[in-house]
Regions:
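Outer-membrane beta-barrel biogenesis signature
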Residues: 19-42
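Repeated loop/turn-to-beta-strand initiation elements of outer-membrane beta-barrel proteins
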Residues: 104-109, 163-166, 228-231, 275, ...
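Extracellular/periplasm-exposed beta-strand and loop segments of Gram-negative cell-envelope proteins
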Residues: 50-91, 113-151, 177-212, 238-270, ...
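Membrane-embedded beta-strands of outer-membrane beta-barrel proteins
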Residues: 96-98, 152-156, 170, 217-219, ...
Length: 333
């Protein structure tokens, strides 16, 4: 998978930095007040860099039929990969979040939206259509733009430990992410038989979207380093994620819809350096990482003209990983 660091560096060129929330999540930014209500608000910009992957597998079935169709595949492998599409995740996103706290409990809610604003990114398509070629039998690269990116996050946190200079807490919540790409112009082809072919056009080839939803639990802490600086960190885990994707193959004349049940995992971690510029205002610099591991689901393909549909149980796969850099302003009142 393309390193999230490389994509993050590319996404930082999309826009000038402005204010943002304390990281790419809904964080407990309201001040602690014993037996009292308090509120916090965050707003700003997040730069995301990473990669999303779309997989197509040979469906499970009769092993003899499978090996007859793909004689080069290992006999032990009944989930031979037919195709994999790697989509660049590079976006500048505006986000707002709020926090309502009573004593040690805090309810946190946030939303982010953005896109890449440019088609200077890649979709790489790898195919293994004739058994197990190393590294592939066919390859193409296309110009791609991440046109829409949404993130919704809600969680409840509870302080377990409070002392001078340190707060430790646990949290549980739910998150939904939506990513949509458009692909215009296919630039490079490579075939086993024909070698490299260069082709450039501005045709609208396909659209792709991923939607993920998951519940998660985690641990976090905040350390007061000096009167002006604090350091915050967290880690979270989701035991399963549910999702769907849709690949509108305009050039090929078909739509592919995939669905995924609660399976695979989501891991996340982050760190934030907070600069207390005033009694109630904080400028924060956050770095967040998230990885949704490979989930296998069902594929349904529909031809545009004939309307003919084909179902492939366990024929689809989806995953993604990103880094997000945030600069922002938090205000507690």
């Amino acid at each position: 998978m393309k390193t999230p660091v490389a994509s993050l560096v590319a996404s930082l060129a999309l826009a000038a930095a402005s204010t943002s929330a304390s990281g790419f999540r809904a964080a407990p930014v309201a001040d602690y007040k014993a037996d009292e209500l308090s509120f916090g608000f965050s707003a700003g910009t997040t730069f995301v860099g990473g990669e999303a992957r779309e997989h197509v597998f040979h469906p499970k079935g009769n092993l003899a039929d499978y090996l007859e169709e793909f004689p080069g595949a290992p006999a032990k492998d009944r989930r031979h990969q037919l195709s994999r599409l790697d989509w660049d995740m590079a976006a500048a996103m505006l986000g707002v979040s709020g926090s309502v706290r009573y004593d040690r409990l805090s309810l946190n809610l946030g939303v982010w939206y953005g896109g890449s604003g440019s088609d200077d990114y890649d979709m790489k398509d790898y195919d293994w259509m004739e058994g197990d070629h190393v590294p592939y039998s066919e390859y193409s690269r296309s110009d791609t733009e991440l046109t829409d990116a949404w993130l919704f996050d809600i969680n409840v946190s509870c302080d377990l430990w409070r002392s001078d200079g340190f707060t430790g807490y646990v949290f549980a919540g739910a998150r939904e992410q939506r990513w949509k790409w458009t692909c215009d112009g296919r630039n490079d082809y490579w075939y086993t038989e024909n070698g490299h072919v260069w082709d450039h056009n501005d045709e609208h080839i396909c659209d792709y979207r991923q939607v993920l939803f998951f519940g998660y639990v985690g641990l976090g802490g905040s350390w007061r380093l000096t009167d002006a600086l604090s350091l915050s960190a967290y880690a979270s885990w989701a035991p399963g994620w549910k999702g769907r994707d849709r690949d509108n193959h305009i050039g090929a004349g078909k739509i592919v819809n995939d669905s995924f049940d609660y399976d695979a995992n989501v891991y996340a971690a982050g760190v934030s350096l907070d600069w207390h510029v005033a009694e109630r205002a904080t400028v924060s610099f956050g770095l967040d990482w998230q990885k949704a591991t490979l989930n296998q689901g069902d594929l349904r393909q529909v031809e545009f003209e004939s309307g003919e549909a084909e179902a492939m149980p366990d024929g689809a796969g989806m995953e993604n990983e990103y880094l997000a850099f945030t600069i922002g302003l938090d205000y507690a009142f």
